[in-house]
Design a protein with these regions (language model features):
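C-terminal accessory/tail domains of diverse enzymes
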Residues: 1-113, 126-212
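Short, conserved phosphate-binding/catalytic loop or strand-edge motifs used
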Residues: 115-119
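Active-site beta-strand/loop microenvironment that shapes enzyme catalytic pockets
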Residues: 121-123
Length: 212
């Protein structure tokens, strides 16, 4: 491994992420209990009064809250519509996340596209620039078909929840080459005709494979 690659890998390990994993066939209280037992804290409780979404939460040994929330897009009985929402994670937490998913699966959780389930990964913005995000958008646009095939995404999910990079956004992004995050945000919303309510959680620009 050359020095440049080594440095890139070390920098990648500093990246913060948040992960959301949708599943069914397990109720949220049961999932939270499994997590609390895995963490060795035994601490889990109903936090819907604070978090909404019929949430149950579990806490790890670092005091971080892992949430299990209701997501209506998941198939099955309402009591078993379960979305794991992690706290902010780093590379060091990957084995913990993987083992938790294994424990949940052993407890009965199921997750695949036929159940209306997906995975969302939120990347921390720290360290990124308009240029790195433009590079990311272009890389994603050139590999989306491979990702869709590998994940066996059906046409409905691609057209509704996992839309490909909007060609209007990509064209303006590469033509204007924004130098500030504010300019990048303007291109993202205006190119897709979603500048109204851009601070709203359910803005119409969401539900792409890549969301900025």
């Amino acid at each position: 491994m050359n020095e440049k690659t080594r440095i890139q890998i070390e920098e990648m390990k500093k990246q913060t992420i948040g992960v959301e994993v949708e599943m069914n066939n397990i109720d949220r209280s049961r999932a939270a209990k499994v997590a609390a037992e895995f963490f060795g804290t035994g601490r889990y409780e109903n936090t819907a009064h604070r978090n909404g979404y019929s949430t149950w939460s579990a806490w790890d040994s670092q005091g971080r809250e892992w949430k299990f929330q209701k997501d209506v897009s998941i198939s099955g009985p309402d009591s078993e519509k379960c979305e794991l929402v992690t706290p902010i994670l780093t590379y060091a937490d990957m084995e913990t996340l993987q083992e938790m998913i294994r424990r949940l699966r052993k407890a009965g959780a199921k997750s695949d596209s036929t159940r209306g389930c997906g995975v969302h990964i939120h990347i921390g913005a720290k360290g990124h620039t308009p240029q790195t995000l433009r590079n990311l958008a272009n890389i994603m646009a050139s590999h989306e078909s491979l990702l869709a095939e590998a994940l066996d995404l059906d046409h409905y999910r691609i057209s509704r929840y996992c839309r490909t990079v909007d060609p209007r956004f990509l064209e303006q992004l590469n033509r204007r080459k924004p130098t500030t995050m504010a300019d990048l945000a303007d291109i993202w919303y205006r190119s897709q005709g979603t500048n109204y309510g851009r601070s709203h959680h359910y803005n119409d620009s969401r539900y792409h494979m890549l969301n900025l």
